[in-house]
Structures are given as C-alpha cells and as structure tokens.
Amino acid sequence: MKLKVEIVGLVSAVLILSSVLALANQSNNEHLLPFKEKTIIDFHAHVAGLGYGNSGCFINDEMRNNFRFKFYLMAMGTSLKELEREGDKVIFKKISAAVADSNVVDKTVILSLDGVINEQGELDKAQTQIYVPNEYVYEQTKLYPNLLYAASINPYRKDAIDRLVQAKANGAVLVKWIPSIMYIDPADPVIIPFYQKMVELNMPLLSHTGMEKSFSHAKDELADPRKLDLPLSLGVNVIAAHIATTGHSHGEENFERILPMVTQYPNLYGDISSLTQINKLGYVKKVLAHPELKGRLIYGTDWPLQFFPLISPWYHLDELKVSEAISISKIKNQWDRDVALKIGMGLDAEAFTLGNILLASKAL
C-alpha cells in the first residue's frame, strides 16, 4: 500500500512538472542521441488487433474488459472506431511512420504472439488472452522496409516444427515467447526437437523472463530464467526479454538468477526493453553494476509501453541531471526519447548496436 501511494504521488508530481514544461520550446534535441547514422534496430515491439480487416488477431473478453485495454489502445495511438474503419493494419502504418521519423532507429522488429495450446496440439482460444498470427505480421511487415518480422510459435502445437520452418522461409528474424501467458514450460524435455530445429535453422528465441504484469493473469513460474537452461544447453541463441527484471523464483530475485547464466552461456543475451518503467526503478543501475552483462545487451523498447505514466525521465533523477530530464522530455519521437533516456542513464552505445551487428553477421 505504501509503495502504491508513493507511485501515485510521484506520478502526480510529474504531471504538474510536465504541464509546466509543455510551455517550453519543443526541440528535437538531437545532441542527446550520440549516433552519427540511423542504424539502431529495436528488437522488441508489440502489435495487437481485434480481427478487423481479416487480420486473424483477437483479444479475449477477459482482457478486453481489463482496465489495461483502453490504455493499450491509447498507447498505440488508435481507437476502436479507427480499427473498425481502417482495419488492424493501421497500427503497422503508424509504427512505420514513427520509426521513419526517428533520428537514430532504423528498423523495428514486430512480434507475433501465439496462444495457449490444448492437449490436441491446437489453439485454445478460451485460454488465450491475445493472439497475433504469424501470417498477419509477415504480410504486413512486407509492406514496410523499416519493419522486420518475428514469428511466435508455441512448441506444443502439433505442427510446431513445420511452422518454424515456414517462419524461417518467410524471413522471420526470431521467435517470440511469453511463456507465462502462452503456458510454455521452456524446461520441458518434450520440446527438445523444437529447440534442435531452432539451432539447425539458426533461429534465435526472444523469451519473456521475470514477472508479467501486462495481462489479466500469468503463470509467472514459467518465466523463471533458469528454465532457459535447456535451450541454452542445446545451443539455441536466447534473448532474455527484460533481463529477468522483477519477480522472484524459488525465493531468489529473477535478476539474480540470470546473472550466473550469462557467464555460463555465451549464447545468452538480454534485451533492455521496459527497464525504465516506473515499476523497475533502479534496474538500469543494477544492470550497469554487473560487468558480465557488457557485450550481452540488445536494444528493445517494448512498444507500445513507452507512454506516461509508465515511463518518464522524471522518475530517474537519481541517475539524470534535471537539465537532462528536461531535454529528454522535450523529444517528440517515442523511439528517440527512449534511446536518449537510456543513454542518459548510462547505457553505452554498444547496447543499441549489438543486435543489428549480430543479426547482420548471422550470429543471432
């Protein structure tokens, strides 16, 4: 209760301060972005849809009735009326335009999202909170040169390996899992053949690690980072989304659980998406305190979760100067603002360029 009161107070203070700063000059503040070229790839951006325009997407009633639903529509810059009129595909158009407007981010990986799979190896719509099919993301990303396709395949599907092969043929750059809402146990030996095929195809796995609070409910025990020991030991290149920030497993902080894994497995990386959210205060500082993470960090935004009150430079005045917070808050482009905030908090340029270097060299 005390923490909630403190967060509400912090948000209120930032609202007042932001109103004052809204009167200030709204410059682009390119000097906050120390990159000579537009080369950064964002490896972690979500889309969603309601099936408009025959997208095949859906959000179940539980999630649509959740308070988060309206916030997510707002964060994606859309509305029910617009989706119905333009189709779900309008979200891709908006993302592409925003990335094109960025001074430093060149491309964004758009994540498909598979659902829960039943005992027959088929999609369980009743258990699935959100579904974004591979085919839809593939077709839409083909239309925009600055959007990259990421597949999502629940390995419990009866045709999971066939889907993986197809995803590779269609140019997917990785496979995305959120085990805690897809009900995948990454440590389940049953899915070893799927992992072996991933290695054969050189297909990386981007898997959520740590507590999940973006959905109506989640089985957080499935996002224990140590469950990734199995794919890592088999040679799968794994990107631990959010570097297991937040949550505990077996009485230990998830972040502490992943640190020895970084030393143990050279094929383990962590993405820096969501690290500046209000529920993760201090985690950038924690990351910087561990030299073993240097050279293992990959840039991601967790778009659309970049909006106030989830993220603000004013939450991080222990790591930013007031002048830096003012300058960052003036940046209009979401991607540029995200990069500037993370740079300002101490993350070095390598964390923003490693992903595209590895992707280009096929090391991912």
PLM region spans:
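H/E-rich (His + Asp/Glu) clusters that bind or coordinate divalent metals
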Residues: 25, 245-364
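Distinct, well-ordered alpha-helical segments
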Residues: 158-168, 186-191, 216-232, 248-262, ...
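Short, well-ordered coil/turn segments that N-cap beta-strands
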Residues: 37-39, 104-107, 143-148, 170-173, ...
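Active-site gating/metal-coordination segments in enzymes
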Residues: 114-220, 284
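Active-site beta-loop-alpha junctions enriched in small/polar residues
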Residues: 46, 113, 152-156, 178-182, ...
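Hydrophobic faces of well-ordered beta-strands that scaffold small-molecule active sites
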Residues: 41-45, 108-110, 149-151, 175-177, ...
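Bacterial N-terminal signal peptides
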Residues: 11-19
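An N-terminally biased module of ancient metal coordination in phosphate/nucleic-acid-related enzymes
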Residues: 22-111, 117-128, 338, 349-351, ...
